[in-house]
């Protein structure tokens, strides 16, 4: 069974700032894609697979006056896999430990609607 078959939600393309770390988010990265149960992250710092981590996901929300507001959604997760590339950023696959209601609402607002 592939990783894609194990996912409860399909991933959406999502490139925004993230911060992550073992005890607190101290390393910078960029998301590649996102779902309520996980994400891929590109960073100069890759953490060890099977590590428990904390991730701050920076999301842009549109306020009533049509201006952008930056909010942080904090999730706990586990590094499932990591790929290290010479002279290039590393990539990590993260599985979130628990469904986060705020993240689910954000995800549902971003998924393309069928006509």
Task: Please annotate each region the language model reported.
Residues 13, 25-26, 66-76:
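Short coil-to-beta-strand transition motifs
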Residues 23, 36, 82-87:
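Short, conserved beta-turn/loop elements at beta-strand boundaries and strand-helix junctions
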Residues 50-52:
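Loop/turn positions that initiate beta-strands
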Residues 58-63:
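Short, charged beta-turn/beta-strand-edge "cap" motif at the junction between a beta-strand
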Residues 85-115:
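C-terminal output/interaction extensions
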């Amino acid at each position: 069974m592939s990783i894609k078959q194990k996912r409860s939600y399909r991933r959406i393309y999502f490139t925004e700032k993230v911060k992550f770390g073992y005890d607190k988010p101290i390393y910078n990265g960029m998301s590649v894609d996102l779902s309520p149960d996980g994400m891929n992250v590109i960073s100069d710092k890759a953490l060890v697979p099977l590590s428990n981590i904390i991730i701050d996901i920076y999301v842009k929300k549109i306020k009533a006056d049509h201006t952008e507001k930056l909010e942080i959604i904090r999730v706990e997760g586990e590094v499932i896999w990591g790929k290290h590339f010479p002279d290039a950023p590393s990539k990590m696959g993260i599985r979130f430990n628990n469904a986060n209601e705020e993240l689910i609402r954000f995800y549902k607002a971003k998924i393309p609607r069928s006509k």
